[in-house]
């Protein structure tokens, strides 16, 4: 099997993937600021890391996936003021929308830490930075990270020129340097606040991710994700804070960033007003199509929204459903044969070669569009060859492969489970076979075996009634 390789934004190279602890992958992804409905740009981040996690799990790793919820922030406070609502209510409303969206997209996150539930840890972390001389308290009571104390600043984003570091201009008058950034924001009237040793206030944005990732994943972990829009300043700042506080290098082994969902040549963004909310997209195209659409482009590339590209994803999804139904039908009807001819062997080899290329694509910097192209070849093989040569072994192998593909795609779950009706039919068929064999046993006067079958089935509520040579049966409800 292919070794997994992944692109690391920090080194700008595709690297061999080796987690800090063998077999255990710790992954942190920057989640949403819950001040508005999620749009289809956010959905890409959710789906890409979920699919990556599923692939790593398929390759035998245990993955712990943490995604934070930013439930206190300038954007939430502003929204609360605009709408004259409590900031907690705003956060609650859009957290619900976020969690519902994940459910629809079939994204499973292991832990969802919220900032407001980690204020104590945030204060302790800031205190460490102050004690170690990396942070200073301004006269207002705000606390800033002193960027000049961390020599590696700018490496992640490739901004080696300090001129390009300037941020949080509104605090410029009290910062030592224009590029220092807030760890703690002093309280202003009308704003939520918590008590801290240097005065009441609330956490800055970047500190939460350093704190919550280390709280759940330890002081060093494997994958840190989020959109490319977060590389500067957010991830640059997170890295500076964490490496300064822990003295561990590297804090994160692989920085993995997803490209932006674009509207034409612009990033899809609330502030530009060019968004499509996820909940509308679900109604229009369905979550499965959307999930596949995200995977049609390489995760590092921008993904430009067009109706045509979504329609293509929809067609692909319909074909996947159709191939699933075909395989299920064949698996019910296929005959088990003990012999295999050369033609069968060739098809079996083709199936296994497809499987191998599926893994080759995904293990090489998680190339999902290539994996989808390989699955497309698989579908053609089922429709053009296996359908007309439904040997049990070929059908079963195809079924197994489809399940394996879906482990990553995550769009066929409802088609791959047997429905209650299908299970009923299966059970009826199995009982009929047992009853038939029992009739033969009775004909051969092997009454002890026949009686044992009747009493064993009886224990499971299946009652056999003999009348002469014939046997009828019923299920005790
Ligand atoms: N257009 C987009 N395409 C892909 N990912 C995006 C897009 N916009 C935001 N993200 C990602 O979604 C996650 C949550 O982002 P966050 O809540 O900070 O978004 P935001 O910046 O508030 O959105 P907006 O720019 O629309 O206001 C982050 O990982 C971010 O990188
Ligand atoms: Zn973050």
Swiss-Prot record:
GO terms for biological process: cysteinyl-tRNA aminoacylation. It is found in: Cytoplasm. It is an enzyme of class 6 (ligase). Zn(2+) binds at residues 30, 209, 234, 238. The keyword Electron transport does not apply. GO terms for cellular component: cytoplasm. Coiled coil: none annotated. ATP binds at residue 270. SUPFAM superfamilies: Anticodon-binding domain of a subclass of class I aminoacyl-tRNA synthetases, Nucleotidylyl transferase. Keywords: Aminoacyl-tRNA synthetase, ATP-binding, Cytoplasm, Ligase, Metal-binding, Nucleotide-binding, Protein biosynthesis, Zinc. A motif ('KMSKS' region) lies at residues 267-271. It catalyses: tRNA(Cys) + L-cysteine + ATP = L-cysteinyl-tRNA(Cys) + AMP + diphosphate. InterPro entries: Cys-tRNA-ligase, Cys-tRNA-synt_Ia_DALR, Cys-tRNA/MSH_ligase, CysS_C, Rossmann-like_a/b/a_fold, tRNA-synt_1_cat_dom, tRNAsynth_Ia_anticodon-bd. Pfam families: CysS_C, DALR_2, tRNA-synt_1e. Binds 1 zinc ion per subunit. Its main location: cytoplasm. A motif ('HIGH' region) lies at residues 32-42. Belongs to the class-I aminoacyl-tRNA synthetase family. NCBIfam families: cysS (TIGR00435). HAMAP family: Cys_tRNA_synth. This is Cysteine--tRNA ligase. It comes from Staphylothermus marinus (strain ATCC 43588 / DSM 3639 / JCM 9404 / F1). The gene is cysS.
